[in-house]
């Protein structure tokens, strides 16, 4: 994934709602309880962790029992320390004090709360990249340092792998044609990191790598769920049982959910977007343009999928008086630069969201060579009377502008192919007139029509017309 191309826009929940979600996550709520529990008698070791004698008391405060109680309590303490909920007061004595961020959980803004939660998320993601170190003592070298080679662990590669998985999960979650609120099967997520995009049938070696990645991700998502990043259905334990053992019950190997299912929470979307922004990606959120000018709206939504563009435009319109908003949109839609056709298309889509109060602004541009065509379309759709018919030159100019916008928005899509076929079918002399249209994109549009039209004779006519258009403009 390149950090130069914008990611699809994400629809985030309000910060106040996300802050409430953050405070209710098991991990942050435990960290906060331990921070408030800590007092003058609390002691930490050289690494800042609770001394062994105090871990049981911490687990009891949190209501934790069972084999994982001590580990979960220690993890909550580490999060409290990493996020500034507690601070080490005296390293030599091992004493602690309340950190400056503890008060933010009750007295700070939603953004303050989310910043604390983001710190907890970073701690957990870092922890998730660390393998199970049961054989840690055997991996210590003579100087007491970890021998990563013996552990077969590359910290940088492991962190990059998890970052890549989370980025892919984010992309799947925000894609217009993605799974939306549906969970993503763990095998599909693992395969997105392992299987080359141009590979047909995966080899046995690749399938084994996918299986290993699934098992790794199963451990990692179990660890990340308590911080509120994901909702996770783990891999069915029966799948990991010894194959020589008889299964306790009949299992359905076709049930993909048994192989793990993961879904980003609204809080998780917020957190991963923040990480992507920090890493230098352009990761827009719907609503980012609501307080900006019409030029920023039309340019900014140019690459948005249609539903996201509409949602962004609705928020933009909601903050403005309709007639003034329409005038601003029309002014921003003017231009003969390469991006202008797509701006006019987005303007036309925005105009479909306003009512009859916009009519005066549309009538004002009826004689405008760039806007008169789309103004007539809007007025006709709204049943306006006394609308002068467009000239033939305006009709052809609008046609070229529309195809240029579709090319910019979708490339060689099936929808554009159908539009091209329809134009050639409805106007027998289309190419004879079209090459004369005084539009910067005329030659490009005619070349595209020649490329897209399935009829070889008509495609040849389009290419000839494109050549004439370029010759006319000295190209």
Segments from the language model and where they lie:
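Short amphipathic alpha-helical interaction segments
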Residues: 67-82, 208-236
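Structural detector for internal amphipathic alpha-helices that build alpha-solenoid repeat scaffolds
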Residues: 191-195, 299-300, 309-320, 342-354, ...
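Amphipathic alpha-helical scaffolding segments comprising HEAT/armadillo-like alpha-solenoid repeats
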Residues: 221-223, 294-295, 322-335, 355-366, ...
